[in-house]
Each structure stands twice: as structure tokens, then as C-alpha cells.
Amino acid sequence: MVKDFRANGFLFRNLIGRFLVWREEKAYRRLKGLKGTPTLYRVVDGLVLVLEHIPGMSLEDAGDKGTVPEGFFDALKMLVDAFHRRGICHCDLKRAANILVGADGRPNVLDWSAAILEREFRFFPLTGIYRRFLIDDLNAVTKYRLRHSPETVSVEALERYLGRSRLEKMIRALRDRLRELLQRVA
């Protein structure tokens, strides 16, 4: 798979595109060898990521077709725990397009451009922000469980999912507006 920013406008390509490629490359290097994440083959000119193609379908499509395998969400939770142990947080798992049901029925997490590394948030108050993003990743798994197999949601996960603070709601609204703006600029 190729993620290419060369076709974007000059400013977006050279400011946003290069930054996103740099961030995503950093994430893939941290994830190297972790089953359930694509392999980064190379970066071209700081604007193109060449990634492993993983056959399968998005979680959204699999859910619509009723083909989410039994045990998928347990495996997804284990994958999320595995990349958290490596000190990386995805930060955009709420988008179903970023989760792939592989041809083997296993979860794969794609699009690491929004990811953050624990070491980038190692000083107070940034440590609290990083912990919040960890919870966000876990809440994404709970969101999909609620949608596709609600009987598998634990009480602890449900309480965590429903316990959003006013600050989190405000940050989410700001993030969504920023995403819309960036999509218009691209």
C-alpha cells in the first residue's frame, strides 16, 4: 500500500504531509514486528510511505455484513494492550476505517499518523494527556464491542466508556473541527 502526499497542494504537501509522514514513520518503527500492524517498507522523499498490504475489510464493512469473527474484539483488545506496552498510543481508533478484519479474521490497526509516543509526553502535565489517549484507545474497543457484541462488554469497560469528562468532550469537539479544516485544505 502506498500513502502519497506528492499530489497535494504545495503548502499542505510540504507542511502537513511531511509532518504526517514523519509521525507515521516514527510510529511504524516503534511497532516493527508487531503482528496486527502493517510493516513499513520505506519512505520516499519524506512524502510517501510504502507499507505492507494486508488483505481484509474494514471493521465497518465486516460489521455491516455480519462477518466480524467471534473473539475478534478480545484479539483487538490484546493488540491495543501490546502497542500500549511499546509506549505508543494510536489516538484515532474511533474511526472504523482504521481497524481491518484481516483475511485470517485477526484485527489489524492501520493509519498511525495521529499516534503519539509515551516518551513525547513524559513530563507533567503531558503525562495526564497521554493517559487520557490510552483510555481513548481502550474506549474505542468498547465502542465497537457495544455495536457488534454488547454481551462481551465488561462492567469496568462500560463504566470507563460512559465516564467522559467535560474536558474530554471539549477536546473531542476541537479535534473534530480541526480534522474538518484539514480535510478542506487537502
Residue positions per predicted region:
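ATP-binding glycine-rich loop module of kinase domains
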Residues: M1-R29
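Short beta-strand micro-motifs within the conserved protein kinase catalytic domain, predominantly
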Residues: P38-L49
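Conserved protein kinase catalytic core
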Residues: G9-F10, S58, N98, L117
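Residue-level recognition of conserved beta-strand positions in structured domain cores
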Residues: D4-R6, R42, E52-H53, D111-W112
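Conserved kinase catalytic-core helix
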Residues: E24-T37, E52, M57-G102, R106-L110, ...
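C-lobe/activation-segment region of protein kinase-like
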Residues: G102-A186
